[in-house]
Amino acid sequence: MQTIALVDDDRNILTSVSIALEAEGYKVETYTDGASALEGLLARPPHLAIFDIKMPRMDGMELLRRLRQKSDLPVIFLTSKDEEIDELFGLKMGADDFITKPFSQRLLVERVKAILRRAPARDAAAAGVAGAAKSADAPSRSLERGQLVMDQERHTCTWKSEPVTLTVTEFLILHSLAQRPGVVKSRDALMDAAYDEQVYVDDRTIDSHIKRLRKKFKMVDVDFDMIETLYGVGYRFRESA
């Protein structure tokens, strides 16, 4: 059974969303503030987390920032219509998706399913998933482009043999670019590679993910410049690495 962590100080949302997710067969763990959520998420990593932004003790943005220092756990944010700036900041911090309040329970469930379909099988020790140890021994599907190595089965990425931790969305965007070096991928093409059809994202979402990818690789190699921007067209991965 897959576990979803739900973090919100609104108990009505906790109750209604929990019911909707449990009806789909998920186990739900709830938290009412960011501080207790951080402790629980690190001690008992779920398969996916859903955060509100405005919460006591620690808001959702700070929770995500601290979580990203130790985990690439998929995260969906719940936002209000007037929190566009927060949404852009959250994408830069590594959020996988946003849902604007008020929202339908069906929409949220579909977003959860979409991200979990894209996410790799999580380690048994991290998520308590039966059979995960078996998948860890399965043959890997790796993509090698010069100094870049991406393993889809294990959701690992290295540059010059140094590990680079990526979220599910970042991994899929980079994998799409690296599959065909030198070929320009439009933002629409990258959206199709990283998101299910029912999930709407705009150009700024892809741009934010690209910025974060570059930042992560530059932390490993300050000279990293393999992702090129072709203004008005899209992005491409350089042919030589």
Curated annotation (Swiss-Prot):
Pathway annotation: Glycan metabolism; exopolysaccharide biosynthesis
One Pfam family cited in the UniProt record for this chain: Trans_reg_C
Keyword list, A-Z: Cytoplasm, DNA-binding, Exopolysaccharide synthesis, Magnesium, Metal-binding, Phosphoprotein, Transcription, Transcription regulation, Two-component regulatory system
4-aspartylphosphate, modified sites: 52
PANTHER family found in the cross-reference section: DNA-BINDING DUAL MASTER TRANSCRIPTIONAL REGULATOR RPAA, REGULATOR OF RPOS
Protein name: Transcriptional regulatory protein ChvI
Post-translational modification: Phosphorylated by ChvG.
Domain Response regulatory: 3-116
Principal location class: cytoplasm
Its job: Member of a two-component regulatory system ChvG(ExoS)/ChvI involved in regulating the production of succinoglycan.
SMART domains to which the protein is assigned, alphabetical: REC, Trans_reg_C
Binding-site list for Mg(2+): 8-9, 52
Domain of life, per lineage: Bacteria
Cofactor remark: Binds 1 Mg(2+) ion per subunit.
Record localization: Cytoplasm
DNA-binding residue intervals: 140-239
Cofactor: Mg(2+)
GO BP terms: polysaccharide biosynthetic process; regulation of DNA-templated transcription
SUPFAM superfamilies the record matches: C-terminal effector domain of the bipartite response regulators, CheY-like
GO function term, MF aspect, one: transcription cis-regulatory region binding
GO cellular component: cytosol; protein-DNA complex
